[in-house]
């Protein structure tokens, strides 16, 4: 009989089973992809293993197992309305990189599911689907496993193909939950592989045996691979015998807390249940994403978080929750997912702070959405009695406004919504997401030349910048050759090399490899799939031959500067954590000879004071002259001594610790100074944002920092000369004096402009008209600049407090316009509406609040026409 297991027990059993079968456990990678710009999020178990499947790297073991957290947001609108849609989920997977294939993969799956030692599922409740032409899989299921033919369903769609790269047939395993979930009926898709609640897919085994080529042909892969996926949430629902994933132990503690806060019960009312499921799903996604370095923003993955949070809060309002509360669920998520994912609990305080701040902001956004909807209703009443579908979609997509609420409010106003256009816009968005998803999953075709080179190449560059060595392999035009002529670009390997390969943000060494017969100028060094350093260079003279004895020399000036910048980067990382907080994590870095660049997670710009503090901390550690001790040790010992592992990096059993204790202890494979005093000087030259919740610091060290400061000093001396001051201290005082004088002169000028405008206008009270019962001043004013029209308006408002005032001006052939409406009249007349009506006439746009709005345009010749039009508009209100 099938065992009733907690989700954490299923996860552990899965990992333990495949470890027994010779698999290596690959730890779950962060949700924010590392070194993969094609993905917004890690969205599958295989996403982090692409480097193994496409041959860029060779894993330590060809058999891999993982439990990978993942985010998919292409079907957000379905989450909450179905039993199993999630934005955050865990994918259990076992993988073979050129090792076992269909026979073992199917046998492993069957044993894990049916053995009493593991899941203990009843074999007669399991069905499988296969590709119609995959007779090998059919024979294994039927003859070797003993599954009767009626339980093997052939489906044409059982072929995994996402474009160029590995592809192949797949087999899916289904669990029959029984007649309580539906009677067999092909017309209702009540069969394994159909859309139904009875037969649940619990495992997908992909047999990757073909390359999908650029010309859309298929060729057999030299190394066949296995890629499988089992959703933990779904397997938990089967094991725990509950109707939906949301009733498992992964979700019910969250549901219980929502019940406490809302006073409503889960599983009592279907409409309420949608809100419960949306909140529970989205808080898991948000908490994990923030713990992995993402932050809410207006673009990219930050926008996804913001949209999810808004959607959850919006649904919480249907449960009567009208204040920030999502942040209170973070501790529950952390407790459920610990200890396999300790990161959420470790960062819980920071996660809660970010979520609470976002919740508070959302209520303002919701009010804005309602205001825009009210404007759309007015527009529809004046035209077609239908709210434009594009406007409704924008309201949904930008403000997170539910289309159902838009429809409900529209019906109350006697209107309808153009749902055809809305659905078209929604479908276009889905199509874009689907295309992006397919493109992002595409893997590179395997490179067999480098993959087949297994001879060793030892890096000796930690201790020396030169080496006497042997050239072992030459690759020219994608093929291994024995010799290369002068002028050609070539890739090559050495038995021993002092050249550092680009890694961990540090650029590769450059230099020369030579003997009496030839010379190669080395420009790049990368890692080959089997770990050797692969050098790229141009043959300067002579003929290069495999087996030649050569001298390898690194450019030592560049090497020294790279060492300074790399060690300074470690100090910078530690200083940022000290000043800003432990939430700071490296999000990317670049260590070159002439500069360093460091990207890190932080939710806002650094203040000047924070930048100064960080810079001073780094320089103090430099001036202390701390010895840089570098040791290799096992990962457990490194963590015990407090070494900081870079977020998202994968480490082996033995790691290299760069120790500048007590300030910085970090795992790193790069090249460093021997003492921090060698860095000399550290200077931050810029701090900026690069996207969603990521900041960037660029800095200089040593001579480059000195030259930068020298240049600033020269500019400062020039400024002193122009200001005619003698001492440095007098510069600020002189600038303050000049700024004060400028302000006074501008104020005088502004007053004079007002007086001139007033003289030109004459008695404005005499120009006020009564239109449709309102006092109205509509006029063109002659002002020197666009700013002056606002000050003129302020002057007029003080004299005509009960009057609707609309001013327009022509400044440098551009139209400026401003409108004000007394607050006592804004229920009937809105300044924003007035400007929106006028602006198109002068070739522009505008808007604003009900009591104050402004706009502009590019057709000053139409100012008079726009003023006449607005008078008629007010007359017909």
Swiss-Prot record:
Catalytic activity: tRNA(Ala) + L-alanine + ATP = L-alanyl-tRNA(Ala) + AMP + diphosphate
Coiled-coil stretches noted in the UniProt entry, renumbered to this chain: none
InterPro entries listed in its UniProt record: aa-tRNA-synth_II/BPL/LPL (IPR045864), Ala-tRNA-lgiase_IIc (IPR002318), Ala-tRNA-ligase_IIc_anticod-bd (IPR018162), Ala-tRNA-synth_IIc_core (IPR018165), Ala-tRNA-synth_IIc_N (IPR018164), Ala-tRNA_ligase (IPR050058), Ala_tRNA_ligase_euk/bac (IPR023033), DHHA1_dom (IPR003156)
GO biological process: alanyl-tRNA aminoacylation
Cofactor(s) required, per the database record: Zn(2+)
Record-listed Zn(2+) binding positions: 566, 570, 668, 672
Main location: cytoplasm
Enzyme class: ligase
Keywords, in A-Z order: Aminoacyl-tRNA synthetase, ATP-binding, Cytoplasm, Ligase, Metal-binding, Nucleotide-binding, Protein biosynthesis, RNA-binding, tRNA-binding, Zinc
Tagged with keyword Protein biosynthesis: yes
Domain description: Consists of three domains; the N-terminal catalytic domain, the editing domain and the C-terminal C-Ala domain. The editing domain removes incorrectly charged amino acids, while the C-Ala domain, along with tRNA(Ala), serves as a bridge to cooperatively bring together the editing and aminoacylation centers thus stimulating deacylation of misacylated tRNAs.
Family in the record: Belongs to the class-II aminoacyl-tRNA synthetase family.
Described function: Catalyzes the attachment of alanine to tRNA(Ala) in a two-step reaction: alanine is first activated by ATP to form Ala-AMP and then transferred to the acceptor end of tRNA(Ala). Also edits incorrectly charged Ser-tRNA(Ala) and Gly-tRNA(Ala) via its editing domain.
Protein name, per record: Alanine--tRNA ligase
Annotated organism of origin: Staphylococcus aureus (strain USA300 / TCH1516)
């Amino acid at each position: 009989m099938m065992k009733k297991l907690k989700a954490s027990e299923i996860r552990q059993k899965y990992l333990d089973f495949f470890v027994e079968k010779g698999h290596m456990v690959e730890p779950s990678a962060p949700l924010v992809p590392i070194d993969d710009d094609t993905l917004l999020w890690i969205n599958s178990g295989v996403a982090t293993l692409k480097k193994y499947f496409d041959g860029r790297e060779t894993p330590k073991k060809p058999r891999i197992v993982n439990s990978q957290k993942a985010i998919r947001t292409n079907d957000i609108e379905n989450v909450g309305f179905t039993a199993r849609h999630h934005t955050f989920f865990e994918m259990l997977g076992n993988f073979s990189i050129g090792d076992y294939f269909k026979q073992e993969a199917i046998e492993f799956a069957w044993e894990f599911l049916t053995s009493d030692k593991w899941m203990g599922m009843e074999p007669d409740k399991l069905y499988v689907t296969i590709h119609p032409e995959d007779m090998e899989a059919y024979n294994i299921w039927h003859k070797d496993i003993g599954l009767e033919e009626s339980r093997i369903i052939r489906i044409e769609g059982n072929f995994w193909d996402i474009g160029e790269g590995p592809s192949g047939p797949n087999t899916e395993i289904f669990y029959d939950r029984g007649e309580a979930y539906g009677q067999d009926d092909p017309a209702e898709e009540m069969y394994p592989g159909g859309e139904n609640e009875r037969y649940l897919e619990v495992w997908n085994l992909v047999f990757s045996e073909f390359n999908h080529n650029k010309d859309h042909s298929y060729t057999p892969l030299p190394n066949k691979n296995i890629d499988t996926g089992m959703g933990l949430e779904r397997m938990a629902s089967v094991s725990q015998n509950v109707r939906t994933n949301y009733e498992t132990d992964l979700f019910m503690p969250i549901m219980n807390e929502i019940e406490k806060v809302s006073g409503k019960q889960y599983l009592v009312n279907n409409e309420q249940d949608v809100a419960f499921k949306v909140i529970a799903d989205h808080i898991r996604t948000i908490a994990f994403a923030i713990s992995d370095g993402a932050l809410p923003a207006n673009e990219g993955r930050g926008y996804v978080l913001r949209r999810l949070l808004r959607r959850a809060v919006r649904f919480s309002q249907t449960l009567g929750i009208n204040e920030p509360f999502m942040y209170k669920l973070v501790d529950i998520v952390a407790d459920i997912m610990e200890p396999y994912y300790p990161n959420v609990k470790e960062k819980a305080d920071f996660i809660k702070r970010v979520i609470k701040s976002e919740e508070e902001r959302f209520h303002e956004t919701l009010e804005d959405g309602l205001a825009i909807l009210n404007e759309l209703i007015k527009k529809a009443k004046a035209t077609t009695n239908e709210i434009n579908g594009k406007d409704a979609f924008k309201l949904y997509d930008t403000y997170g406004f539910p289309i159902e609420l838009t429809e409900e409010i529209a019906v109350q106003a006697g209107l309808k919504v153009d749902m055809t256009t809305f659905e078209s816009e929604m479908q276009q968005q889905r199509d874009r997401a689907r295309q992006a998803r397919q493109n992002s999953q595409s893997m590179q075709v395997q490179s067999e030349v480098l993959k087949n080179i297994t001879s060793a190449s030892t890096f000796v560059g930690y201790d020396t910048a030169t080496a006497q060595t042997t050239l072992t392999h030459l690759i020219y035009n994608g093929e291994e050759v024995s010799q290369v002529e002068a002028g050609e670009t070539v890739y090559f390997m050495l038995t021993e090399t002092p050249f550092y390969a680009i890694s961990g943000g540090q650029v590769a060494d450059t230099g020369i490899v030579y003997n009496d017969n030839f010379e190669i100028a080395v420009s790049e060094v990368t890692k080959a799939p089997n770990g050797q350093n692969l050098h790229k260079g141009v043959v300067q003279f002579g003929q290069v031959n495999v087996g030649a004895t050569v001298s390898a020399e690194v450019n030592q000036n560049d090497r020294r500067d790279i060492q300074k910048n790399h060690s300074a980067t470690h100090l910078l990382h530690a200083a940022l954590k000290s000043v800003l907080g432990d939430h700071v994590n490296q999000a990317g870095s670049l260590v070159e000879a002439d500069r360093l660049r460091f990207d890190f997670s932080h939710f806002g710009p650094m203040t000047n004071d924070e930048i100064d503090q960080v810079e001073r901390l780094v320089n103090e550690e430099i001036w202390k002259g701390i010895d840089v001790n570098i040791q290799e040790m096992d990962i457990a010992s490194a963590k015990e001594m407090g070494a900081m592992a870079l977020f998202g990096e994968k480490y082996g059993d033995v790691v290299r610790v760069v120790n500048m204790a007590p300030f910085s202890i970090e795992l790193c494979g790069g090249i460093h100074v021997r003492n921090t005093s060698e860095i000399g000087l550290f200077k931050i030259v810029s701090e900026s944002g690069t996207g969603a919740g990521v900041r960037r610091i660029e800095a200089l060290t040593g001579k480059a920092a000195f030259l930068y400061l020298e240049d600033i000093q020269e500019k400062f001396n020039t400024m002193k000369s122009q200001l005619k001051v003698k001492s440095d201290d007098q510069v600020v005082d002189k600038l303050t004096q000049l700024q004060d004088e400028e302000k006074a002169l501008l104020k005088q000028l502004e007053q004079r402009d007002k007086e001139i405008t007033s003289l030109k206008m004459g008695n404005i009270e005499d120009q006020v008209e009564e239109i449709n019962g309102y006092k109205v001043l509509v006029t063109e004013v002659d002002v020197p600049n666009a700013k002056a029209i606002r000050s003129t308006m302020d002057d007029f408002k003080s004299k005509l407090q009960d009057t609707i005032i609309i001013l327009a001006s022509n400044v440098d052939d551009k139209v400026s316009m401003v409108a004000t409406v007394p607050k006592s009249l804004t229920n009937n007349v809105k300044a924003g509406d007035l400007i929106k009506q006028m602006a198109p006439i002068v070739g522009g746009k505008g808007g604003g609040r009900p009591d104050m709005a402004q706009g502009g345009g590019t057709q000053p010749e139409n100012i008079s026409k726009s003023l006449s039009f607005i008078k008629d508009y007010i007359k017909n209100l």
